[in-house]
Amino acid sequence: RNARRSIFKDDKDRWILLDTLEEVNDRYHWFCHTYCLMNNHYHLVIETPDGNLSKGMRQLNGIYTMRFNRRHGSVGHVFQGRYTAILVQKESHLLEACRYVVLNPLRAKAVEVPERWRWSSYRATAGIERARPCLTIDWILGQFGSKRRTAEKRYRAFVMEGMRGHRIWDDVKGQSILGDEDFVSRLIDYARGYEEVKEIPKVQRYLNRPNLTEIFKNSRGEKRKRNGGIAVAVKRWGYSEREV
């Protein structure tokens, strides 16, 4: 988001962002279920099987900034501050989150119906145009039936019903979690435990850790096993990459 100026000077910039998103999806194994490009910000609904949102967002915004500046002969930041991320429970809230995102242009009074906004994923998911490579629509349509045309029709009706509903972001807990009570509670407990682990001094935390010889004793000569050993040494036992 950039509160003071547009992050897109023209439609070419918008295509560049979507092309960059496609590259990031491929590199970080993301699934983009929904997107909406506004003038001074954009929204994405991203599924990250590898839990690498931060790395991917740095790549997405960084590469787009580089391409934007090169194209327009400018320097400096395109985006102001850090992005806002909300963790969404897939089973109960992801569909609503996707609907909320594609209705942004209507809430901003930029258009009266979602299909008039070219720069969201609504048109592709609704069957009006072909989906760009950066977009995954199968999961959303699968929630509305197995027959494509029927699913698209039900999706369009579902989106329009959202204009009469409440704001889903009013249900966000702790400014970062959207889900049912059990989901929120489990995540808060997990985060609390993670913070407690970080408080334990490193020497105490890794008091009984195996040495590197033990970790790698069964991986000699096998690249795949050695790579697995490196991951265990660094992530599980706190060795630095230099030590490994």
Briefly describe each language-model feature range.
Residues R1-M38, E47-E243:
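Short Pro-Cys-Gly-centered "Cys-loop" motif that presents a nucleophilic cysteine in a tight turn
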Residues H43-L44:
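Amphipathic alpha-helical hairpins
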